Design a protein with these regions (language model features):
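Short, intrinsically disordered, charge-balanced linker/junction segments flanking boundaries
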Residues: 1, 177-183
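Beta-propeller fold detector
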Residues: 1, 39-43, 77-81, 118-122, ...
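An edge-strand/N-cap motif at the start of beta-rich repeat modules
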Residues: 1-36
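Repeated scaffold domains used in trafficking and secretory/extracellular systems
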Residues: 4-12, 44-53, 81-90, 122-132, ...
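Generic beta-strand structural signal
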Residues: 11-12, 20-22, 51, 59-61, ...
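Residue position within the beta-strands of beta-propeller blades
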Residues: 17-20, 57-59, 94-96, 136-138, ...
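Structural motif
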Residues: 24-29, 63-68, 101-108, 142-147, ...
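Short loop/turn segments that connect beta-strands within beta-propeller blades
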Residues: 32-36, 69-74, 111-115, 149-153
């Protein structure tokens, strides 16, 4: 067996690394911190890895379905069939619903324990990115950058988005309480 592993997406939780292996078509694996006990967790090609409460949440690259895989039992469960982007935090899954194959869609959050779903935005959004207590995004029809609180109660406009200045969440990086934008 090839002992060389190329890692694409990865997350580290208490000494275990979860990753999509480039050498196995982005299948989901885990390995402990000393590179022993490598274990395949899914036959799906995966992306958008998130860890919460002994579960790895991910999107299947083939159909963009949202799954949960238990890191102990290896059990997989289909959570949602229409997802583009995900973030998991404090008992909630935040996701962008797929809009007919487009890279835009309405933002939702789902309670992990109850399965209750709440709509966060009325309009379709692009490029959602969660940081601390906000999800940043552009609307589908403009270049203005917004932030919305995780419960959807407060919307903040962060840029004017005129024709000369276009701000996108994927051009941002975060440090402490600051949001930095590369333009």
């Amino acid at each position: 067996e090839n002992n060389r592993v190329v890692i694409d997406s990865r997350i580290n939780e208490s000494g275990t690394v979860y990753y999509a292996s480039d050498s196995d078509y982005q299948k989901l694996y885990s390995v402990d911190k000393n590179s022993a006990n490598r274990q395949k967790l899914s036959d799906n090609s995966v992306c958008e890895l998130e860890m919460y409460d002994n579960n790895v949440y991910y999107l299947s690259k083939n159909d963009r379905h949202l799954y949960r895989a238990n890191d102990i039992t290896g059990e997989e469960e289909l959570i949602n069939k229409t997802v583009n982007k995900i973030a998991v935090d404090d008992g909630w899954i935040y996701y962008q619903e797929s809009d007919g194959g487009k890279k835009s869609g309405v933002l939702y959050r789902m309670n992990i324990d109850s399965g209750d779903v709440e709509r966060l935005t009325d309009n379709s959004v692009r490029y959602p990115k969660k940081y601390k207590d906000y999800i940043y995004f552009n609307l589908d029809n403009d270049n203005i950058m917004y932030g919305i609180t995780l419960d959807g109660t407060s919307l903040v406009k962060l840029s004017m988005g005129d024709s000369d200045v276009k701000l996108y969440p994927f051009n941002c990086f975060y440090h402490g309480d600051y949001l930095f934008v590369e333009n």
